[in-house]
Amino acid sequence: VLADPASGLRRGPQTADAPVLASGDHLLRSTWANDHRPDLVVQMGAMPTSKGYRLWLDRVGTDRLVAVDHLGRFPDPAHRVTDRVAAEPGRLAALLVEHLPEVQQTGPWTSTWTGADSVAMSTVAAIATDGPFDEPAVVAALHRTLPAGANLVVASSMPIRDLDAFLPTDERPLRILANRGANGIDGMASTALGVAAGSVEPTVLFTGDLALLHDLGGLLATRRLGLDLTVVLVDNDGGGIFSFLPIAENGHVDHHRLFHTPHGLDLGPVAALAGGRLHEPTGLADLESVLGSVVGNPGLHLVHIVVDATTNVGLHREAAAAVDRALSRALSDDGG
């Protein structure tokens, strides 16, 4: 199971004995994946976040691609789906388990993928924790410090992609929620407050600066509603996701002004404006200490982390390249 972070499958007791893989984006970008072509792919729910998944389908393909969805979506931008099933994915999975013969979870095919995932995630974890204090390190801190059962609301654009690339599996449950779609960055603070209002567990919003700016009005309602919320804000002064586009390397275009769209604002005072407290950690250990002390505490806490979009691009690409090298070495050591 290549688990998108928004599926919720990466965190919980099911990871103890089910083949749930966290490194799908990196695995599918690697040369290793070229030699591991499945006969059948079943895509449950919405189109996954991973661009690596889409590139892999273009590069390697599969005999059958079955899309399972019950919301009338069309999760097939490349028109590769061969079969469509109108069913709620979780319910269909339960019926399959009930009616199909016992599925072998320890066969050679499964073991090959789970072994590759183990190599990939150990490689990725080292980059997140040993590299610069940037978005991958923030994901590592969230993974290690959020209490079991907490709600993690994740903004679109880079936060959900950072989570996809760097969040490992863990038996501790974590409820991950994400707004996806054409207007995915809108209403993030309001969404997080709605989650906080409907849950007794701590709620954390992981967001970028533009997404927060798009819903400052929602954030201002925190004190009036008497809700508790921790906002982990990665601030790269603009739209970091556009630094991943090929046009970012086009010297004839003012990419920074036209695509990154810097706002030039200091977002720290937003905490006081909304009646909350500001925290500005300067490193991974500091961030983990802050999260450990504020998550679940009363009121609004804004954890403001200044990051660099170019650095984050480099870390994502470094992770993909390092996983590719590590898998090649593992195959060589195994005589494969």
Predicted feature residues:
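Short glycine-rich anion-binding loops that position phosphate/pyrophosphate groups of nucleotides
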Residues: 6-7, 45-49, 71, 157-160, ...
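Glycine-rich, anion-gripping cofactor-binding loops and their flanking helix/strand elements
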Residues: 2-66, 74, 170-201, 214-217, ...
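Redox- and metal-dependent alpha/beta enzyme cores, enriched for Fe-S-associated oxidoreductases
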Residues: 1-15, 147-150, 162-163, 228, ...
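Short acidic-hydrophobic, aromatic-tinged amphipathic segments that line or gate anion-handling sites
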Residues: 18-29, 82-96, 263, 278-285
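Thiamine diphosphate
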Residues: 162, 167-336
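Active-site diphosphate/adenylate-binding microenvironment
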Residues: 114-200
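Terminal amphipathic helices with adjacent charged low-complexity linkers/tails
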Residues: 64-111
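Conserved acidic residues
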Residues: 39-40, 82, 150, 300
